[in-house]
């Protein structure tokens, strides 16, 4: 093609030269427009001022909307309340080191104050201990420097991580901490296992809580489910560090490891737990759901043929609400029973005031007129049967021993 036959170069849109010069045209040679492809025609139309088509507008609009949809969608997902909460958490974390310094300063100031009072009491001829107790009264809580481990295992099943919200997961973490504390400081305690410890719950303990759980003594965390944890617990209880048959088990010295059983505790069970047995494993559901998933623990156990039972709250306590307890309350009640062997007293020392728990009148009369050892036998005869649901009509489920776990796991895998 010769120089004079070539079309003029099309100038870019928006340039000042394009507006000052004469209108530009394409196809200086006849028939050139017909020879061009549709794509080239479209491109050439976009390059001509005022020649933009509807298709070009449609292609530009989604691009602009895509660029603006991202931030709007993000803002819709995060509410103002969540933003404020996140800001508070960031502020709390930022001042962590500052709080440590303040605590150390307060501790040092308190020690210095006690030392000054001690010296002052000695100069005045007074008893320093009495003077210090007046200003710094000792706590009345009983502390046991050394606990006695019993051949009994408590497993907290945390396999409900996907069913909980973030705030419920935070609450469960607090309940696990309190459960460990109650079991650890008790005069008689059992083996404590946290099963299905994974996903977001584990992430919270390792990040927000700075792995403080790794320093807990007498507790084991495992990613396995509660059924596998129960099998391993049976082997541990038979070992040299399995525990001693003392305290509440001192009259069961003839108990054998094969007599132990596995029980999943749930308020939906028709069977009531009467006592804790040596070499047995009790599973507690680690779920905080505000009763959204009712009966899920009971269903989980019955599908595998595991025995279920509920604490005897209805026999001793008059409740103002549904007898569903937090995980740490269940652990505390069982630990207190190991010390007292008295369900009524264990409930009264553990239940929070908001539950409105009070001893039933029939139980009060029993405790006043009947020796502590005979309370259980009188209860079975029907002394308090009028105020509790009839559980004798339901035949207790056959106990599952640790030997049966392999068969249960095989059936679970086959399904």
Curated annotation (Swiss-Prot):
Q: Where is this region: Disordered?
A: 1-84, 354-415
UniProt key word Repeat: no
- The main location class comes to cytoplasm
Q: What single Pfam family name could you report for this chain, choosing any that match?
A: tRNA_m1G_MT
Biological process, per Gene Ontology: tRNA N1-guanine methylation
Cite a GO CC annotation. Answer: cytoplasm
- Sorted UniProt keywords: Cytoplasm, Methyltransferase, Nucleus, S-adenosyl-L-methionine, Transferase, tRNA processing
Which major enzyme category is it?
transferase
| Molecular function via GO | tRNA (guanosine(9)-N1)-methyltransferase activity; tRNA binding
The family this protein is said to belong to: Belongs to the class IV-like SAM-binding methyltransferase superfamily. TRM10 family.
Purpose: S-adenosyl-L-methionine-dependent guanine N(1)-methyltransferase that catalyzes the formation of N(1)-methylguanine at position 9 (m1G9) in cytoplasmic tRNA.
Complex formation: Monomer.
In Swiss-Prot or TrEMBL terms, this protein is called tRNA (guanine(9)-N1)-methyltransferase
